[in-house]
């Protein structure tokens, strides 16, 4: 019996070590996946979206030929200054108004990676789940159906951090607007003033459009059906984390 124990001991130890190694690898993979699906936006992502929104707002008024009259006519005979609207402080103030509020128009697209997960429009996952509801499938997200389209925790955090960053770097934005518009705002603000060089990776992430199916709606429908089947296989009452939608 002692001999048997002597033989089995190393075998059991080997099995135990194998189980521990397998569990460690699984836990690490799970952690990496959760890091990208359950996280708050980084400072890089906040700055990226802030600069994108501001440049987009300014681009809508950049071609205006309106001329503003500034100042008052005084007894000294000084005349009002005429300033092109496209170069005026008024234009910047109007672009900044409700800038961070517009961040709430973004949604979390959990099927995308990195900063690309934050985009306007409905995510593929949410579209699929709403399609299931329309077909009569009961989907449990832990929140009422009427709240599905409300801003998520991540997007709300984005908006708050946008306000904080804008307040902190207001002078930098003004300096760029009046003196450095030949440079992209994202480079001038994010790379030169807000972020250390080691934290700028998200600025280089760009949506290529290759992930979309431009023609061939059948292929898109097939993918949606496969996802629906995967969801309904779990049970008649599939559950999802609303933060991943």
Swiss-Prot record:
Pfam families: DUF3456 (PF11938). Highly expressed in lung, spleen, thymus, and uterus. Moderately expressed in kidney, stomach and placenta. Weakly expressed in brain, heart, liver, small intestine, skeletal muscle and testis. One of its GO terms (cellular component) is extracellular region. This is Protein canopy homolog 4. One of its GO terms (molecular function) is signaling receptor binding. Interacts with TLR4. Residues 216-230 have a biased composition (Acidic residues). Transmembrane segments: none annotated. Plays a role in the regulation of the cell surface expression of TLR4. It comes from the Eukaryota. Its main location: secreted. Disulfide bonds join 44-202, 47-190, 100-162. Residues 209-237 form a coiled coil. The gene is Cnpy4. Belongs to the canopy family. Residues 1-27 form the signal peptide. Residues 207-245 are annotated as: Disordered. GO terms for biological process: positive regulation of protein localization to plasma membrane; regulation of protein localization. Keywords: Coiled coil, Disulfide bond, Secreted, Signal. It is found in: Secreted.
